[in-house]
Amino acid sequence: MVVNDLLDYWLNKGWTKETTICSIHDPLCSCVLKSKVAVIDFDAVKMGYEKLHKIASPASVDALRYDEKELTFIEVKGWKKFLDFTSKVTEEKIDKKRKDYEYKKKLDDSLNICLQTIREQNLISEDEFCRFPKRYIVVIDVQVKKEPLASLAVSLQMLATSSTSWDTMCWQKTQSDVDQIPQEDYSGLNMKHPHLVSCSDFDACFSSP
């Protein structure tokens, strides 16, 4: 399979290992619905890469998932802890927190680590990697009801200050951030448009059709 040599290189270097998004996000996770999908810890790959090249730490996604169909870049963000431990949650505080997340930069730097490793180690052809199907999934630990809301602006006006409402706001704003990642920036990389899922729905993204 196309990307196997790349993953094997990182594993053989001892830079990373197989894990789950729950272990990456919160090693002491007490959720009942823990993810069972095996992923590669990409933050660990980034650390190995920066030590090898003696560079300032790049951004990176949290994990990779690879099968014969596609390579998935995965970024995990936890809103629940922010909501639970922030005094007097406001929309302004949520917006300030969002600025730290840099979803596009994490994807861009991760792709660069992959491409640079392929070039330096001559593992597979760069063209093969670029043509192989890819996608970017942002995973968060809040979710909203399945009923669609009319629009972000309208839905935010409807919010009260209950925890469910703040969950909804975090979901809607994260969805907006993910939707704004420009697809045209990844032309030639066979990258699907990024999408957002809740952690409870993550495993379903990899179930057989």
Task: Give the location of each predicted region.
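Catalytic cores of nucleic-acid endonucleases
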Residues: 79-144, 169
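Acidic (Asp/Glu-rich) sequence patches and key acidic residues
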Residues: 60, 73, 83-85
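Short, flexible loop/turn elements at secondary-structure junctions
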Residues: 28, 44-46, 67, 78-80, ...
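Catalytic micro-motifs at enzyme active sites that drive phosphoryl/nucleotidyl and oxygen chemistry
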Residues: 51-54, 61-62, 122-127
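Conserved catalytic cores of phosphodiester-cleaving nucleases, focusing on short active-site segments
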Residues: 63-65, 70-78, 110
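Short, low-complexity, polybasic intrinsically disordered segments
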Residues: 128-197
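Short connector loops at helix/strand junctions that flank enzyme active sites
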Residues: 56-60, 69, 131
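Basic, amphipathic N-terminal segments that precede the first structured/catalytic domain
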Residues: 1-58, 199-209
